[in-house]
């Protein structure tokens, strides 16, 4: 917090709107309004409670929040993450990838309620129907490399390490289909216009995070 204070920021756009960032506001700008701290609370519509507003899709909330701060939101409602893609020919050739289904069976250690436990069952069902038409792959993060061995899928690494965000974007973009828990790669897939399915638990709804 001391390091943040040293920068003497004059405007903060809080798009996470979490209990953690709310705590930051109380410490850094305890009496701040919209002019200093832009959040879902400081830009809350007059006719809605915070609880009601938070039920709206996240992009709708971002759009309202930024517009309330005078920012043009040309791309907010239609994000395109394809700019992040890079050439992954080396990886594609190394793993002989052509038609593949990309799986993201992982989740944050403290959010295990997001983890769907039937990915191997799904792989077996698809293999039974489509035989060898598709390869199944995972692209684990740095702390998920060992966990990836639990799944009947090829573990994609770059020189023994987790692929970069840009490489991951390209793997998603080139995939035949994506199946993911409610994690970062699922949102990347949505904004890369990839075909796929995200599995949501009882913690949220597809509409709320769409």
Residue ranges and their predicted role:
Residues 1-210:
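Catalytic machinery of carbohydrate-active enzymes
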């Amino acid at each position: 917090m001391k390091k943040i204070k040293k920068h003497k920021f004059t405007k903060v756009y809080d798009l996470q709107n979490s209990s953690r960032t709310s705590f930051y506001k109380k410490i850094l700008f305890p009496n701040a309004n919209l002019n200093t701290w832009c959040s879902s609370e400081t830009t809350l519509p007059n006719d809605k409670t915070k609880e009601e507003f938070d039920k709206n899709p996240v992009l709708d909330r971002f759009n309202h929040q930024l517009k309330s701060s005078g920012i043009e939101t040309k791309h907010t409602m239609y994000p395109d993450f394809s700019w992040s893609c890079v050439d992954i020919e080396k990886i594609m050739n190394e793993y002989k990838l052509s038609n593949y289904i990309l799986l993201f069976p992982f989740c944050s250690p403290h959010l295990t309620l997001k983890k769907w436990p039937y990915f191997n069952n799904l792989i077996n069902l698809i293999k039974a129907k489509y035989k060898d038409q598709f390869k199944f792959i995972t692209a684990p993060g740095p702390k998920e490399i060992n966990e990836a061995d639990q799944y009947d899928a090829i573990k994609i690494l770059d020189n023994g390490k987790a692929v970069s965000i840009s490489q991951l974007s390209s793997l998603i973009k080139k995939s035949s289909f994506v199946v993911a828990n409610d994690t970062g790669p699922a949102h990347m897939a949505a904004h890369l216009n990839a075909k796929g399915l995200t599995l949501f638990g009882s913690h949220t709804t597809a509409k709320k995070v769409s």
